[in-house]
Design a protein with these regions (language model features):
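Acidic-and-aromatic substrate-binding clefts and catalytic sites of carbohydrate-active enzymes
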Residues: 23-28, 54-55, 92-98, 121-128, ...
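Mid-to-C-terminal alpha-helical segments outside catalytic/metal-binding sites
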Residues: 2-44, 71-79, 100-104, 112, ...
Length: 313
C-alpha cells in the first residue's frame, strides 16, 4: 500500500506536480489507511512512496526530502506497529547518500526494506553506477521493492491521453528488470529480495523471446549470457492491479507460487476496484485454496519472519 505523508504532499505542490504520471495525487491520512485496511481485510501493510521519486536535481533538497519522508513514515508506523511497516525512500541517483539513508532507515528507524523506482533521471536499476548500493542491500539481504515511474525518455505527441500507469509503467518495469538481468544484478547480488510489481508486467510475455535472443547475444563484451528464466524465478511478485485474468496464469509458468504476494496499490487504486481485484484472486480457478492462502498470507510471513511476531504482539 502506498502512503502520502504531509512532506510528500508539500513536495508535489512545490514542484507543481498536481497530476503526477497522469493521475491526481490521491487523498491519504492515517485514518484513511486504517479504514482501507479494515475494508480490504488487510491485517498488515507495508507503506511505500509511489512515483515520482524525491530527486529534484538539488542534492541537498533530495536528501532532506528522503529523510523527512522516512522519519514521518517511521512515526506513522509507531502508531500501529502491529499493522504497519514501511519501505525506506532513498535519494537516488545520489548513491553514497542513498547508502547512508538506507543504513539509517534499516538500523535506526527499523524499516522493513527499501523501495526503488525503475529509474532515477535515466539511471536505471541494473546500472553499474548503483553497484555500491546493491552491495549494501545484498549484505543485509534487504527486501527491495521495485516501482515504475516515468520513463527517462517520453515520445512527444504519442498516447498523451493515456496515464502512464496504464501502459508505460509496465514497459518501465520490464525494461528495468531486463537491464538488471543483462548486467548480472541478480547474480552479483543474490541476497537482495526483489519484489517486482504488477505480476511482473510484460515479463511473462517476453521471457521466451528474450531468452532466445540471449542465446545468440553476448552481454558486456563477455561470454556470459543472461538467463532471464532463472532471474525471474529468483524474484518475488506482487499481485497489484488487474492481474488475475491473464497475467497470473502466465507468471505461474515461470515462477513458483511461493514468490507471489497480494498487493492493493491503494490509494492510487480506489477501494472499490481493490475489492474487485481481491475477490477475483479469491475466486479464481487458477489457484488452489492452499495457493491462495500463500498468496494472501503465507508467503509474506515466510519472507518477513518478524511479521508474525508483530501481528500477534
Amino acid at each position: 500500500m502506498h502512503y502520502l505523508p504531509k512532506v510528500y504532499y508539500d513536495f508535489l505542490e512545490e514542484e507543481g506536480l498536481y497530476c503526477p504520471d497522469g493521475f491526481p495525487a490521491p487523498e491519504w491520512d492515517e485514518a484513511w489507511q486504517q479504514e482501507a485496511m479494515t475494508e480490504l481485510c488487510i491485517s498488515y501493510a507495508l507503506l511505500s512512496i509511489s512515483s515520482p521519486s524525491v530527486f529534484t536535481g538539488n542534492k541537498f533538497r533530495s536528501r532532506e526530502l528522503a529523510r523527512k519522508i522516512n522519519e514521518e513514515g517511521a512515526q506513522i508506523v509507531s502508531h500501529a506497529p502491529g499493522n504497519l511497516g514501511f519501505l525506506a525512500t532513498l535519494p537516488l541517483p545520489l548513491v553514497h547518500s542513498s547508502i547512508f539513508e538506507a543504513r539509517y532507515c534499516l538500523d535506526e528507524l527499523h524499516a522493513d526494506g527499501v523501495g526503488l523506482m525503475t529509474n532515477y533521471g535515466g539511471v536505471y536499476l541494473g546500472d553499474r553506477r548503483l553497484d555500491e548500493l546493491m552491495a549494501e542491500l545484498d549484505g543485509r539481504g534487504a527486501l527491495t521493492v521495485m516501482h515504475p515511474t516515468q520513463p527517462a525518455v517520453m515520445v512527444p505527441d504519442v498516447n498523451e491521453e493515456i496515464p502512464l500507469p496504464a501502459f508505460e509503467y509496465f514497459v518501465e518495469t520490464t525494461r528495468a528488470f531486463l537491464n538488471m538481468a543483462q548486467n548480472d544484478t541478480f547474480t552479483l547480488y543474490p541476497n537482495i529480495r526483489w519484489v517486482v510489481p504488477h505480476m511482473g508486467a510484460f515479463l511473462s510475455i517476453l521471457a521466451d523471446r528474450f531468452e532466445s535472443f540471449a542465446l545468440m547475444l553476448r552481454f558486456a563484451d563477455s561470454d556470459r549470457r543472461a538467463d532471464i528464466m532463472e532471474d525471474m524465478a529468483h524474484a518475488y511478485y506482487d499481485a497489484a492491479g488487474f492481474s488475475e485474468q491473464k497475467q497470473l496464469e502466465m507468471l505461474l509458468r515461470n515462477v513458483d507460487e511461493s514468490h507471489l504476494f497480494y498487493g492493493s496499490d491503494t490509494p492510487y487504486t480506489d477501494i472499490t476496484a481493490c475489492v474487485g481485484q481481491a475477490e477475483a484472486l479469491e475466486q479464481t480457478a487458477k489457484l488452489t485454496d492452499a495457493q491462495k492462502q500463500k498468496l494472501f498470507t503465507g508467503n509474506a510471513l515466510a519472507l518477513l519472519p518478524k511479521l508474525k511476531e508483530r501481528i500477534h504482539a
